[in-house]
C-alpha cells in the first residue's frame, strides 16, 4: 500500500472515530497555499481542525512526535485562511488524532493538541 493510500485510510479511521463521538464532518483535506488540514469537523458550535498522524512502528518516534512546531504553524495558517471564507468566526480548536499499532487501529484523540499562541 502506498503512503498516500495509508494516509487516506488513516484519515477515514479518524473521521469515523470522531463521528462516533458526535463530531460532524465539514471538509476533508482542505488545501491552500499555506498548508493542508486533514479534517475540519464541527463539535457543537466549535469548529475543529484535525491533524491525523499514523505510525505503525516506533522506529522514528510515535505519531504525536511528528506534529512539529513547523507543522503546527502550517495548520494554523491554513485554518486562518479557511476562516476568512466564513461569514462569522466560530470558536475553534486544534485536535490531533494519532493512530498506531497494527494497521493503525489504536487511536488516541488529543483535544486542543496545540494552540494558536504557540504557533
Curated annotation (Swiss-Prot):
It holds the Pfam family UPF0102. GO terms for molecular function: nucleic acid binding. CDD domains: PoNe_Nuclease. Coiled coil: none annotated. It comes from the Bacteria. Gene3D superfamilies: 3.40.1350.10. Belongs to the UPF0102 family. This is UPF0102 protein Nmul_A0195. It comes from Nitrosospira multiformis (strain ATCC 25196 / NCIMB 11849 / C 71).
Amino acid at each position: 500500500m502506498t503512503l498516500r493510500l495509508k494516509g487516506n485510510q488513516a484519515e477515514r479511521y479518524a473521521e469515523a472515530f470522531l463521528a462516533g463521538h458526535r463530531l460532524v464532518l465539514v471538509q476533508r483535506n482542505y488545501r491552500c497555499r499555506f498548508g493542508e488540514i486533514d479534517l475540519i469537523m464541527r463539535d457543537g458550535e466549535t469548529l475543529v481542525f484535525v491533524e491525523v498522524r499514523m505510525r505503525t512502528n516506533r522506529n522514528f518516534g510515535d505519531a504525536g512526535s511528528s506534529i512539529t512546531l513547523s507543522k503546527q504553524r502550517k495548520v494554523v495558517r491554513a485554518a486562518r485562511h479557511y476562516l476568512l471564507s466564513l461569514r462569522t468566526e466560530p470558536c475553534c480548536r486544534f485536535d490531533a488524532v494519532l493512530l498506531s499499532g497494527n494497521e493503525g487501529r489504536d487511536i488516541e484523540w488529543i483535544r486542543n493538541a496545540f494552540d494558536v499562541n504557540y504557533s
